[in-house]
């Protein structure tokens, strides 16, 4: 704002003389009038520029008076091109000045320009230099960041200058500190000398000290990148220096991503010895980043892990890799590569896309030797079947076409060898599903060609090229009270083998089969009231009949087919097998009934109970190799229940019951109690007769609840206040073997500005071996983490359903939340 347009009453009698300070008790008459006018304009909220609206001289063009414009929102960030046009507001107990030269404000002085506010006992502002000098109780609020001190010199628009004996507090993370001097470089950068930095909030006790604090020779603050860089710094915890850094290190000022070293991890492993890893994060672009993690293992050598991620409007993915030269454990180089890619492009004649999921490792023992790797690279690699799966697809309206290649790497164990699945080199699939057909009919056609390849010495059967086609037509009859859907399917399959079948001596086989099904159901509704609550109760009986004639398929090898799991999702289907190598001969009727309790306000399901059973009218002769034909007329009974009576409680159960033996074959019972944030208990019982019987319990719960301390609700991802202990864990116990299979148990302590975690993890890796780790971490909130072993947060998230991190990333607060 230009102060040259002060109104005439504020002009001194002799313009060449500076304005003199006078006693406020006896101001001259012209100053009384001027201050009265100035006070009136200040009360009305007008900038000093408005004081210049005097009559224009002869020939001059009158400038329009400034006016306020309505806006639907406050601007979080002021545009750069608008800053030079921003007016300056000043007020205080005593204001004097010279036009085009300066202004002086004494007593409760305040200067405002855009998102910058300066308070002081005395403030001098020089117009030509845009320079503000302030003394006594000086306070700057710059976009929510607050600086306080004794002496300030600042170029207001450029925001460059210095502040002596200063303290500061940042809006984004609540961090604050003290400094001998603050040099403001520009609006986003500052250099703080002999500085401290912490996020521990002060209390009223005179003996209070921050739990952790950084002391540094200097700290460079970059609010644009939200990064702090400390030179000659040391991290103190509970008054003890724990991490001196003679050089420089960076730390975040918010949750924004930044390039730099991530917290290191130190661990001890019985196989690898002492393990030290130091991740480096590279923020390449807003939609691309990379993490490189060198790792030193005292018993094995040095390895490097890397991860690259990318995100575009039409595609995304990640590339991971590990490399360890001359691993002393196996006396060879070890490596792993992984790629995941997903993408779809609009071509104008449909969308074309590519999906890739590929993983490869150097040797069969990789899954065993690197099963606990979590810092970069291939994470949690414990599976022994690794895919290299790529699918190129196209789709438009009712039609789709895809080309897929799938090749497996099987990691064999000499003590437990497995038969690898078949590669698909390639698989071509075409599908057509018209959105509407005349007469209310529905229909679809699909065709598939797959070349199955594998090592015949391991599979014991020939490879094959399989061509498959299926057409289906249905006519749904729908009404509010029920539905009837007849459906007719035609299956045609042709096999070409690379060698003669042992059973027939032929190199080809074919199969053509029809399938008919009739699905029907009714829906009855009534108002009901249970336990003081109103519900809409439904009763939904369902009958499903299917018929497929018998065709001998015993000579056809199995390439991609398996028996479906027996549950409520598969009991109402035409074929009991997934894949296309077996189509079961069926003449059966499935009967079931479900009742639901629905909330009449929002339609939410409070409870669900169901039962279903199959009635077989003839034996099922088509089976998988090693299976016996099915001759029982009545199948096992499926009984299921799900209860979500409130948002806090949940219960789900499915039981497969054999009425002939009066015993359950398989049971799954689960319950959840989640009364509020950071309080959850999950329990499950799983039973499969003759195979396994396990109890699984997982939890996260504040221990302070035991003595009546319920904590505070600080919002999502903010914890429940300081001084709180949390118990976390998961126990998987085998009743059949009478031992714990998997164990994760630990504690978390939240002290507001730091969080401590200690977790014991024991995971079964085979029948006879298990991996045990002790994980320890201190998180300095808003600064960094120090870990011993792998990151316990990832372990807790992977093992405890509904586990909540005590400090989730949250959007930065608005600058108007700290507005003066």
Curated annotation (Swiss-Prot):
Belongs to the LptD family. One of its GO terms (biological process) is Gram-negative-bacterium-type cell outer membrane assembly. Residues 13-22 have a biased composition (Basic residues). HAMAP family: LPS_assembly_LptD. InterPro entries: LipoPS_assembly_LptD, LptD, LptD_C. Residues 1-27 are annotated as: Disordered. This is LPS-assembly protein LptD. Component of the lipopolysaccharide transport and assembly complex. Interacts with LptE and LptA. Together with LptE, is involved in the assembly of lipopolysaccharide (LPS) at the surface of the outer membrane. It comes from Paracidovorax citrulli (strain AAC00-1). GO terms for cellular component: cell outer membrane; transporter complex.
């Amino acid at each position: 704002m230009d102060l040259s347009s002060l109104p005439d009453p504020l002009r001194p009698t002799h313009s060449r003389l500076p304005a003199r300070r006078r006693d406020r008790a006896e101001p001259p008459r012209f100053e009384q009038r001027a201050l009265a006018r100035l006070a009136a304009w200040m009360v009305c909220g007008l900038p000093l520029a408005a004081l210049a609206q005097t009559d224009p001289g002869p020939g001059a063009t009158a400038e329009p008076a400034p006016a306020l414009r309505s806006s639907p929102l406050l601007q979080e960030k002021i545009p750069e091109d608008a800053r030079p046009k921003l007016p300056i507001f000043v007020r205080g107990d005593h204001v004097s000045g010279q036009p085009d030269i300066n202004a002086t404000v004494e007593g409760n002085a305040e200067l405002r320009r855009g998102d910058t506010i300066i308070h002081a006992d005395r403030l001098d502002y020089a117009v030509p230099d845009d320079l503000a000098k302030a003394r006594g109780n000086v306070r700057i609020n710059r976009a929510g960041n607050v600086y306080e001190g004794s002496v300030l010199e600042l170029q207001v628009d450029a925001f460059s200058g210095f502040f002596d004996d200063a303290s500061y507090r940042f809006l984004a993370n609540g961090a604050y500190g003290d400094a001998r001097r603050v040099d403001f470089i520009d609006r986003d950068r500052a250099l703080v000398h002999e500085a401290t930095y912490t996020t521990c909030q002060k209390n009223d006790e005179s003996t209070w000290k921050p739990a952790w604090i950084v002391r540094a020779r200097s700290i460079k603050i970059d609010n644009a990148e939200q990064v702090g860089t400390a030179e000659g710094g040391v991290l103190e915890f509970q008054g003890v220096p724990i991490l001196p850094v003679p050089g420089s290190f960076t730390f975040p000022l918010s949750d924004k991503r930044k390039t730099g070293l991530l917290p290191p991890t130190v661990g001890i492993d019985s196989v690898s010895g002492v393990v030290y890893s130091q991740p480096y994060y590279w923020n390449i672009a807003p939609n691309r980043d990379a993490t490189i993690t060198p790792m030193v293992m005292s018993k094995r050598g040095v390895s490097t892990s890397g991860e690259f991620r990318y995100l575009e409007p039409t595609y995304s993915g990640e590339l991971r890799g590990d490399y360890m030269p001359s691993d002393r454990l196996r006396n060879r180089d070890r490596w792993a590569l992984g790629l995941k890619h997903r993408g779809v492009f609009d071509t104008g004649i449909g969308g074309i896309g590519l999906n890739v999921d590929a993983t490869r490792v150097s040797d069969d023992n990789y899954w065993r030797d690197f099963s606990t790797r979590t810092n970069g690279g291939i994470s949690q690699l414990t599976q022994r079947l690794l895919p290299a799966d790529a699918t190129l697809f196209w789709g438009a309206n009712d039609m789709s076409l895809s080309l897929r290649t799938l090749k497996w790497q099987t990691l064999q164990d000499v003590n437990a060898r497995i038969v690898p699945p078949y590669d698909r080199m390639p698989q071509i699939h075409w599908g057509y599903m018209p959105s509407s057909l005349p007469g209310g009919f529905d229909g679809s056609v699909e065709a598939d060609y797959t070349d199955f390849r594998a090592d015949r010495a391991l599979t014991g059967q020939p490879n094959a090229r399989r061509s498959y086609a299926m057409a289906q037509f249905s006519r749904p009859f729908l009404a509010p009270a029920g539905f009837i859907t007849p459906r007719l399917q035609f299956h045609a399959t042709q096999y070409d083998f690379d060698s003669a079948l042992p059973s027939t001596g032929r190199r080809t086989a074919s199969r053509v089969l029809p399938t008919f099904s009739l699905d029907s159901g009714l829906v009855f509704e009534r108002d009901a009231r249970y336990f003081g609550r109103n519900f809409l109760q439904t009763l939904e009986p369902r009958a499903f009949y299917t018929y497929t004639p018998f065709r001998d398929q015993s000579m056809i090898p199995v390439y991609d087919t398996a028996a479906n799991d027996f549950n409520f999702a598969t009991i109402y289907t035409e074929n009991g097998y997934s894949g296309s190598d077996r189509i079961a001969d069926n003449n059966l009727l499935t009967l079931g009934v479900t009742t639901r309790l629905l909330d009449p306000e929002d339609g939410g399901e409070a409870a669900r109970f169901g039962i279903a059973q199959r009635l077989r009218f003839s034996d099922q002769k088509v089976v998988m190799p090693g299976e016996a034909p099915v001759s029982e007329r009545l199948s096992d009974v499926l009984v299921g229940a799900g209860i979500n009576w409130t948002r806090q409680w949940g219960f789900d159960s499915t039981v497969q019951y054999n009425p002939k033996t009066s015993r359950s074959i398989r049971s799954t019972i689960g319950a959840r109690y989640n009364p509020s944030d950071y309080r959850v208990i999950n329990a499950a019982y799983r039973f499969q007769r003759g195979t396994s019987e396990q109890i699984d319990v997982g939890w996260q719960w504040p221990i302070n609840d035991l003595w009546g301390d319920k904590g505070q609700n600080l919002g999502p991802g903010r914890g429940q206040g300081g001084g709180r202990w949390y118990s976390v864990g998961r126990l998987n116990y085998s009743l059949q073997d009478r031992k714990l299979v998997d164990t994760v148990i630990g504690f978390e302590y939240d002290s507001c500005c730091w969080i401590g975690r200690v977790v014991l993890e024991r995971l079964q890796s085979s029948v006879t071996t298990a991996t045990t780790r002790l994980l320890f971490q201190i998180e300095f909130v808003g600064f960094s983490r120090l870990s011993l072993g792998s990151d316990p947060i990832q372990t807790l998230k992977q093992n405890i359903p509904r586990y909540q991190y005590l400090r989730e990333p949250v959007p930065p607060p608005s600058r108007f939340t700290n507005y003066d």
